[in-house]
Regions:
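Helix-loop-helix hairpins and the membrane-proximal interhelical loops
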Residues: 1-49, 212-307, 451-454
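Helix-loop-helix junctions within the multi-pass membrane cores of secondary transporters/permeases
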Residues: 2-36, 57, 78-87, 91-139, ...
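Alpha-helical membrane-protein architecture signal
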Residues: 12, 16, 191, 270-274, ...
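Hydrophobic/aromatic residues within the transmembrane alpha-helices of Major Facilitator Superfamily
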Residues: 23-30, 63, 67, 144, ...
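Helix-coil boundary and interhelical linker segments in multi-pass alpha-helical membrane proteins
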Residues: 38-49, 89-99, 266-270, 368-370, ...
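Loop-to-helix transition at the N-terminal end of transmembrane alpha-helices
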Residues: 44-63
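Juxtamembrane transmembrane-helix boundary signature
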Residues: 58-79, 110
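Membrane-embedded alpha-helical modules
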Residues: 93-214, 350-460
């Protein structure tokens, strides 16, 4: 049955590989179950209810990806989009979280229509192959940087970024942490990178997953030995699962279906809606391009078969997520970790979805996975994705420069969508001014996108 539905042999994989890949993807993105409630709670939303909404949105979205597209991609409420929701729309602009959820709901409906009418698919196919390869490389740098940041290996400083030290960490965050909380976690993360790297070199099956589990176990040993001292006030929690509150599922009642349609025709609402639309659209396209390129899923023309199903799953998940009570649900770049483990079909996504469903009942275990244990996985996956740099044509500067701009913009501006927009603008402008555009037959949609991106930078 699995073979028939997921076409395992056709995709050169097997059930064991797919399940392991699904577990790996879940382990690298399980942090969202802890981080999203924390961010959304800043708006006054019930954190327990947001945890339930987050797990359910991830479960529904990832399952839809498997059913609609048979791809190994996982979905969950997106980082960055949740921060925009909480700190810009609600706290910064003064709107209620119910109003912000309504904008997310409207975005989902619009995306469903765009997906059904092939607009999103057309945008995906309009991007030149060189830029698609650049997106993959840029995402590799981006998620490697996220991993280093999550592990506090790099911290803010006078040069914007610098190598970790306890003093530098304290100055950057305005806290008084010590070696026994932040310092030891950095050492554990570095050890995790080395351990995971060795497992990769030795070609150990499930190397990324094993890297996460070994690093977490080392942390628990350090906690028992007194080398790691939890401090909840500073964000350093016990590495042991907390079953003191049992295994009950937090109620959704405080946030379920709390949409507020009053004032949706205001200019502010349109601006908020457009921001959600823009970031989600190009983050999703960027993730699909990057991860698909790494998995060799793109056809000879650089197109992704069944992309309509993938985009529709993303759109429907966002709509359901808003009703459940969480910010935009989107395709996660951490899906690359499962792809790196050999995941090629929807069975990987089904496995990840099931684990998100189980997390509702086993939240203490999943919430205990620390960021320093998942950080090495992100760093190593970044290495995997960098390999696509060999597909970029560096002999043609009209191709190389836009690719370069796209690559460096993602980590430097901390945004996949900004990298894509700058890559598209530079590609169109350079090829148009140099006269290369005629020979390359650049898609008309690329010109439209470039103009829209320029207008965005001018007016938003």
């Amino acid at each position: 049955m699995l073979e028939k539905f997921f076409k395992l042999s056709e995709n050169h994989t097997d059930a064991k590989t797919e399940i392991l890949a699904g577990i790996t993807t879940f382990m690298t993105m399980a942090y969202i179950l802890a981080v999203n409630p924390s961010i959304m709670a800043a708006t006054g939303m019930d954190s327990g209810a947001v945890f339930t909404a987050t797990a359910l949105a991830a479960f529904i979205g990832t399952l839809l990806m498997a059913i609609f597209a048979n791809y190994p991609f996982a979905l969950a409420p997106g980082m960055g989009l949740n921060a925009y929701f909480a700190y810009t729309v609600v706290i910064g602009m003064g709107y209620t979280w119910q109003y912000a959820l309504t904008a997310v709901f409207a975005e989902g409906i619009i995306f469903i229509l765009l997906s059904l009418t092939n607009v999103r698919e057309a945008i995906f196919n309009a991007i030149p192959m060189n830029l698609k390869s650049a997106v993959s490389v840029g995402i590799g740098l981006f998620i490697a940087f996220v991993g280093l940041q999550n592990a506090h290996i790099v911290v803010g400083g006078s040069t914007l970024l610098q190598l970790f030290s306890v003093d530098a960490y304290n100055k950057a965050n305005g806290v008084e942490a010590s070696f026994n909380n932040v310092g030891i976690t950095v050492i554990l993360a570095l050890a995790g990178i080395i351990i995971t790297g060795i497992l990769v070199v030795k070609n150990i099956k499930g190397n990324i997953l094993w890297g996460i589990l070994i690093t977490w176990t080392l942390g628990i040993i350090c906690q028992f030995a007194g080398l790691y001292v939890p401090n909840a006030d500073l964000g350093f929690y016990s590495l042991l699962p907390d079953f003191s509150k049992g295994l009950s599922i937090p109620s959704l009642t405080p946030i379920f279906g709390k949409l507020q349609f009053k004032g949706i025709f205001s200019v502010d609402f349109i601006v908020i809606l457009f921001a959600f639309l823009f970031v989600d659209l190009f983050d999703t396209i960027g993730t699909l391009v990057g991860v698909s390129a790494k998995a060799d899923m793109l056809d000879e023309e650089g197109k992704l078969p069944h992309i309509k199903g993938a985009l529709l799953a993303d759109a429907v998940a966002t709509t359901f997520g808003a009703i459940l009570g969480t910010s935009t649900t989107t395709t996660f770049v951490e899906s690359a970790s499962g792809v790196s483990e050999g995941g090629r079909t929807g069975l990987t996504a089904v496995t990840t979805a099931i684990l998100f469903g189980l997390s509702l009942f086993l939240s203490p275990i999943f919430l205990a996975i620390p960021s320093f244990a998942t950080a090495p996985a992100l760093v190593i996956v970044g290495l995997y994705m960098l390999s696509n740099v060999t597909n970029i044509n560096f002999t043609d500067m009209s191709e190389a420069i836009p690719a370069y701009v796209c690559i460096i913009a993602m980590p430097f501006f901390y945004s996949i969508s900004e990298g894509i927009s700058m890559g598209i603008i530079s590609y169109v402008v350079i090829n148009l001014i140099t006269g290369e555009a005629k020979d390359k037959k650049i898609s008309a949609l690329m010109y439209v996108l470039a103009i829209l991106f320029i207008l965005k930078y001018i007016f938003l």
